[in-house]
């Protein structure tokens, strides 16, 4: 009722599908022009959502086929995140689950919810650990305990088939507060992105804190967000083209000190480009003006 009373010209839902209330509002026609942002990186499938505000770098040439909305390809990453929203490193601290644990020689992190990890990719985790004997792989528990338990069983079976002891080399951390997550991101040596449903805000934070992220892009936008961020920043050496390359790249970053140091230097040189892309804001303004006159 409040929205209807305000009579908005344009209504933008940043992430349809992430909040139950928004999920109830989005099917309604509450404004002449209604848009979905890419906070939830899939089509809404709703006839009253007219446009999907996407990213030119994240989408493939035929991406419109993935949307019921008209896809609006905003320049570059389609977003302009604010790095000052992250907690200062000085305020970050390790999670209690890591107290008293000796540091491994190399620490890989997979920062996504296990629900985003496809069973067919579990072998990649095992092969990487097999190739770096002094490495650990850290994961973060799902918001659902049953998913975490199932993932742990999956991981154990797959690692065992590759001769890797998952109990000693795979750590599943509990859900983390932002100050704990900030410490973890800074502490690990490399973030291994998930291909089917890649990171976005986690990738921005990792690079902001100076930690490399490597990825294997998928075909749809939800699996191409880290790829687009790395491509936009010129960090192409951190992008794998195949699953075999994904494994070999992770092993090289963990074992080739010069190659790893070069990636750290590249990240240090581009951190000021992680936020403040005014071209995205100007393009969104232009699109909204044109959408109200039907000139889109």
Which positions does each model-derived feature cover?
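Active-site-proximal region of nucleotide-activated glycan assembly enzymes
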Residues: 29-93
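A donor-sugar binding/catalytic signature common to diverse glycosyltransferases
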Residues: 10-31, 35-46, 178-226
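C-terminal amphipathic helix plus adjacent low-complexity
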Residues: 112-114, 141-143, 150-158, 248-296
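Conserved catalytic-core segment of nucleotide-activated headgroup transferases in glycan assembly
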Residues: 76-177, 290
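Catalytic binding pocket for nucleotide-activated donors in carbohydrate/polymer assembly enzymes
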Residues: 185-186, 190, 194-275
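Short, well-structured alpha-helical segments in soluble
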Residues: 1-7
């Amino acid at each position: 009722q409040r929205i209807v009373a305000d009579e908005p010209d344009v209504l933008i839902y940043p992430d349809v599908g992430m909040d139950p209330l928004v999920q109830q509002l989005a099917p309604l026609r509450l404004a002449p022009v209604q848009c979905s942002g890419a906070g939830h990186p899939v089509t809404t499938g709703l006839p009253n959502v007219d446009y999907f505000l996407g990213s030119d770098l994240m989408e493939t040439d035929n991406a419109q086929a993935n949307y019921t909305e008209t896809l609006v390809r905003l320049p570059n990453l389609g977003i302009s995140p604010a790095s000052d929203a992250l907690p200062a490193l000085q305020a970050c601290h390790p999670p209690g689950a890591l107290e008293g644990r000796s540091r491994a020689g190399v620490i890989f992190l997979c920062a996504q919810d296990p629900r985003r990890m496809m069973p067919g990719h579990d072998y990649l985790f095992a092969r990487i650990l097999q190739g770096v004997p002094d490495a650990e792989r850290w994961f973060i528990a799902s918001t659902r305990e049953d998913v975490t338990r199932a993932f742990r069983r999956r991981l154990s079976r797959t690692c065992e088939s590759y001769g890797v002891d998952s109990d000693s080399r795979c750590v599943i951390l509990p859900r983390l507060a932002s100050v704990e997550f900030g410490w973890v991101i800074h502490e690990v040596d490399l973030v291994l992105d998930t291909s089917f449903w890649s990171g976005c805000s986690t990738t921005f934070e990792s690079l902001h804190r100076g930690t490399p992220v490597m990825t294997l892009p998928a075909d749809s936008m939800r699996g191409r967000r880290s790829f687009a961020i790395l491509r936009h920043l010129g960090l192409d050496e951190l992008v794998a083209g195949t699953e075999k390359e994904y494994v070999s790249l992770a092993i090289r970053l963990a074992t080739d000190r010069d190659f790893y140091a070069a990636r750290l230097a590249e990240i240090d040189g581009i951190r000021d480009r992680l936020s403040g892309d005014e071209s995205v804001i100007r393009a969104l303004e232009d699109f909204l003006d044109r959408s109200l006159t039907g000139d889109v």
